[in-house]
Structures are given as structure tokens and as C-alpha cells.
Amino acid sequence: MAKLDVALAKVEGHHKEALLWFKRFRGQRVTWAEIKEHAEFGARLVNQAKGIYKPAYTDFALSVRTIQDGPYPDKEVEFRANGSWVCQYYQENIDPNQRDKEATNRGLMRCMEEQIPIGFLIKRKPKPGVEYEVLGLGFVKAWEDGYFTIEGINLNGETTDGIDAARARASQPLLSDPDDIFDAKDVNDLRQKQIATVAV
């Protein structure tokens, strides 16, 4: 089980400052202007030209962001009832065989190897007045066929590995939106609750 406080102790300076920003603003919406303003007075959070941001001062990637109608086949984020989430995020470069050609991808691989968290943003409002939802911090858990599996931390600041992760996925109903509320009158909600109860 990966613990966030242990992982954050591995980084320092602007890198740590930026990751703490993602932790602090988890669950909030921020404007693109606010993100750019933070870079003027503190650590840079994203790369304006790319979805993956790997600062020049480190071998690790710092953040990823998704946008509607982007050039890569990123998959929808799946939210869990315990506050965690998972996303299949596509690498930079459409050819999986060219993964290591891009510094951004190498940065995400280093994060996976050393279990350094990354920040995650989802674009929720297009121009004008672009807004992003801050999902907070997650860990790169795997790479396969061009997709990085990124697991978001739960409300206790932890994420799970291996068999535990599979068990957690089986026992936690996936929510299409983090604001979804259980409805006892909804047959699908009841079915998900029954499945989760049996799995536990």
C-alpha cells in the first residue's frame, strides 16, 4: 500500500510545492488563469502545450491533464466510493513502441518505478474561461499498450497495490461522477450496493 506522506518525503523544492498544491486543491475547480498565476509566484503546475508535464529540473513527471477532444485516446476516469479513482491515460506519441522517445513518458515511467505521485487535472469547461477539476494526486501503477494506469489516492491518503488493488476495485462500486449519491429507489444503485456487500 502506497502512502502519500512517505512518497512526498522523497521530493523537495518546486516539485514538492507543486504536489502539495494538487493535494490542497483536491476536488475543487480552478481556472486556467489561476493555474498560470500560480506559476508566476510559485511552482509551475502544468505544461501549456502538452498533457504531461515533466519539469526540466527533475527526471520525474509532475502532472497530467485531460481535455475534451484531445489528440490521444484517454479513457474516462472511474471514481470510487472510497474517494479514490483510476484512469487509463495515453502516453505522448500515438505509437506505443515509441514510448521512451518522449521525455514526458520517461518521466511517468520514473514515477512508476520510484512511486512518486503526480497531479491530475480534468478539463471541465472550454474557452472562454477554461476550468479544470483538480482530482488531486495519484500514482502510476502500470503501463500497457500505450496506456498508463494512474490510481488516485483515497480519503486516507493511500492507494493499493497488486491483489489488494484488484480486491478494492471489486468491492468498490464505480461512480460515473464523484457527486453521485446513492438512490435506494434506483435499481442500478441497489444492484451495485449488493455486489459491493457480497465482495466485501
Where do the model's predicted regions map?
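Intrinsic structural disorder
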Residues: 1-2, 11, 64-67, 121, ...
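Long C-terminal interaction/binding lobes of large macromolecular proteins
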Residues: 2-18, 22
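Acidic, glycine-rich low-complexity segments with interspersed aromatic residues
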Residues: 28-125
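Ordered hydrophobic segments in well-structured contexts
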Residues: 63, 117-119, 134-137, 149
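Short, well-ordered, mixed-charge alpha-helical segments that flank or form enzyme active sites
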Residues: 127-131, 159
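Short beta-strand-centered aromatic/proline hotspots
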Residues: 130-143
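Short, solvent-exposed secondary-structure boundary/capping segments
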Residues: 146-153
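Short, charged surface segments at domain edges that flank catalytic/cofactor-binding sites
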Residues: 155-200
